């Protein structure tokens, strides 16, 4: 079985970053809520306790039984985790005289200790805490300090138990990855053999054993996750996988034909379904974003169910669920409040009474892309920007008509094509155009016009949880605006969205 690091989540915004940094070392790890920790077995090589927005001084502060891990496994507490270990061991945690948030420099670094091996004195780290450890038990040893924090890191003498007040998972901690390597590789003894190649080999074997000769149906979206999931399952069961790709009339220009051809070249058995009329009919008169999402989701389930019933003896539904979806559903805070409902597959398993197979549900997005590369999937698929399940329906503010879709498809096509031509596409996490529900006055050919306004959006992000708007060159934006207004009939004004997430979301609806 695969060896792993167990990360116990106390609600920190950075917990997923810890997991990503550990996995970048080719070491498998899992995140579990602190109050739903799994039983320790022989595969667990070490435990990391995350940060938290809580204080160990609070009456109902998140707590665990440290005896389950101490002196049994290497243990690393990060920020709140470090304070928790110290507090429960008899140390004193108090509010900081000044809240330390941002960059700090380590001093008095014990580089002789395995945790700080090759960490340079004066190394920059990232702090984010309101409490601080002011007294440590007699069997604790301070490993480093900062100008304002005496106990920036410590070790329990005679144990592989450590605490650090800073966040090594954040890129502002310049040697954070090295420190995590010291813990995971040198102290925990992980062998660094969790690679995309190893994942593919193991997953295909597991899928063969799990599915056997049963048939699987999978809905393709043209995106990375469903595509990689399909190829993995296909490698395991071959023609017993049938994929369904639905044209809901809300895709980008030429997308249906291009993606369908790509899938067929990949050797997948794909059924293409032209359902534009059904989707447009279900969206008639709807302008509320949530109502549009739900209508699209309901229609997708109907279409997918109809097509699936044409395939005899299907037992499994394949899905491209990835690890952040799983983490969110079992997070410390519980499932998040619904900001936007998921567009399609939510009702499928119940309606179709199929067993679920999710081969990517342990992977982050960047890992899915690396696995796709290992599988030989073309960059046209792997490097595609995320595209919302409801498609252009949530980029057309207000009601949906075929005419509006056609206008937005042309605008989007120009924007994306020029990003690719100028070498900017791969620098952007996600880009697209939005048709606004307003018109503006303009002048074209000495005549007054009163036509549509479109917004362009381009953001950078690691995982879509947060995002910054991209500073596209002014000349590029000027050229794009000019081309859109001249080529797309019905548009006389172009604006550029310079909002970050939060407070805005990436999509407008």
UniProtKB/Swiss-Prot annotation:
EC number: 6.3.5.2
Residue span(s) of domain GMPS ATP-PPase: 194-384
GO MF, any single term: ATP binding
Pfam families found in the cross-reference section: GATase, GMP_synt_C, NAD_synthase
SUPFAM superfamilies given in the database record: Adenine nucleotide alpha hydrolases-like, Class I glutamine amidotransferase-like, GMP synthetase C-terminal dimerisation domain
Alphabetized UniProt keyword annotations: ATP-binding, Glutamine amidotransferase, GMP biosynthesis, Ligase, Nucleotide-binding, Purine biosynthesis
Gene3D superfamilies given in the database record: 3.30.300.10, 3.40.50.880, HUPs
Protein residues bound to ATP: 221-227
Keyword Lipid metabolism (UniProt): no
CDD domains hit by this protein: GATase1_GMP_Synthase (cd01742), GMP_synthase_C (cd01997)
Pathway info: Purine metabolism; GMP biosynthesis; GMP from XMP (L-Gln route): step 1/1
Positions annotated as active site in the UniProt record: 79 (nucleophile), 167, 169
Any one GO cellular component localisation term in the record: cytosol
Glutamine amidotransferase type-1 domain residues: 4-193
UniProt catalytic activity: XMP + L-glutamine + ATP + H2O = GMP + L-glutamate + AMP + diphosphate + 2 H(+)
InterPro entries, per the entry: Class_I_gatase-like, GATASE, GMP_synth_C, GMP_synth_GATase, GMP_synthase, GMPS_ATP_PPase_dom, NAD/GMP_synthase, Rossmann-like_a/b/a_fold
Task performed by this protein: Catalyzes the synthesis of GMP from XMP.
Oligomeric form and interacting partners: Homodimer.
Name of the protein in question: GMP synthase [glutamine-hydrolyzing]
Organism: Cytophaga hutchinsonii (strain ATCC 33406 / DSM 1761 / CIP 103989 / NBRC 15051 / NCIMB 9469 / D465)
Lineage, uppermost ranks: Bacteria, Pseudomonadati, Bacteroidota, Cytophagia, Cytophagales
């Amino acid at each position: 079985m695969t060896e792993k690091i167990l990360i116990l989540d106390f609600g920190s915004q950075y917990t997923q970053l810890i997991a990503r940094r550990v996995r970048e070392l080719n070491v498998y790890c899992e995140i579990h809520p602190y109050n739903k920790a799994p039983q320790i077995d022989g595969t667990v090589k070490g435990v990391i306790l995350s940060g938290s927005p809580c204080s160990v001084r609070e009456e109902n502060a998140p707590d665990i039984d440290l005896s389950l891990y101490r002196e049994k496994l290497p243990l690393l507490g990060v920020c709140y985790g470090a304070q928790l270990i110290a507090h429960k061991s008899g140390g004193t945690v108090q509010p900081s005289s000044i809240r330390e948030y941002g960059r700090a420099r380590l001093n008095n670094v014990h580089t002789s200790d395995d945790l700080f091996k090759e960490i340079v004195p004066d190394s920059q780290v990232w702090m984010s805490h309101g409490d601080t450890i002011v007294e440590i038990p007699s069997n604790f040893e301070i490993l480093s300090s900062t100008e304002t924090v005496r106990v920036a890191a410590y070790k329990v003498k005679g144990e592989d138990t450590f605490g650090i007040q800073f966040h090594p998972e954040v890129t502002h901690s310049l040697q954070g990855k090295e420190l995590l390597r010291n813990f995971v590789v040198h102290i925990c003894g992980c062998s660094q053999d969790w690679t995309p190649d190893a994942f593919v080999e193991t997953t295909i074997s597991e899928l063969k054993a799990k599915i056997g000769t049963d048939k699987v149906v999978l809905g393709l979206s043209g995106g990375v996750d469903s595509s990689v999931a399909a190829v993995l399952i296909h490698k395991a069961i071959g023609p017993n996988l049938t994929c369904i790709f639905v044209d809901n009339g809300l895709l980008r220009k030429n997308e249906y034909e291009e993606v369908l051809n790509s899938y067929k070249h990949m050797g997948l058995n794909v059924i293409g379904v032209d359902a534009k009329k059904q989707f447009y009919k279900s969206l008639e008169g709807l302008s509320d974003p949530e109502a549009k999402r739900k209508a699209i989701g309901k229609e997708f389930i109907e279409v997918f169910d109809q097509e699936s019933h044409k395939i005899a003896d299907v037992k499994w539904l394949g899905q491209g669920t990835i690890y952040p979806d799983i983490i969110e559903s079992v997070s410390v805070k519980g499932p998040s409040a619904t900001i936007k409902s998921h567009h399609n597959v939510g009702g499928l398993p119940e309606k179709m009474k199929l067993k679920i197979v999710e081969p990517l549900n342990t992977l982050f997005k960047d890992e899915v892309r690396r696995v796709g590369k290992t599988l030989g999937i073309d960059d046209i698929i792997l490097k595609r920007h995320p595209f919302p399940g409801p498609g252009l329906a949530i980029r057309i503010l207000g009601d949906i008509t075929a005419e509006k879709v056609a206008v937005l498809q042309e605008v989007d096509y120009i924007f994306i094509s020029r990003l690719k031509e100028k070498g900017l596409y791969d620098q952007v996490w996600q880009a697209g155009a939005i048709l606004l529900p307003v018109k503006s006055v303009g002048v074209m050919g000495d005549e007054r016009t009163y036509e549509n306004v479109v917004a362009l959006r381009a953001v950078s992000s690691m995982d879509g949880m947060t995002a910054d708007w991209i500073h596209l060159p002014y000349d590029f934006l000027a050229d794009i605006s000019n081309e859109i207004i001249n080529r797309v009939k019905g548009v006389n004004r172009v604006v550029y969205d310079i909002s970050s997430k939060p407070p805005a979301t990436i999509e407008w609806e």
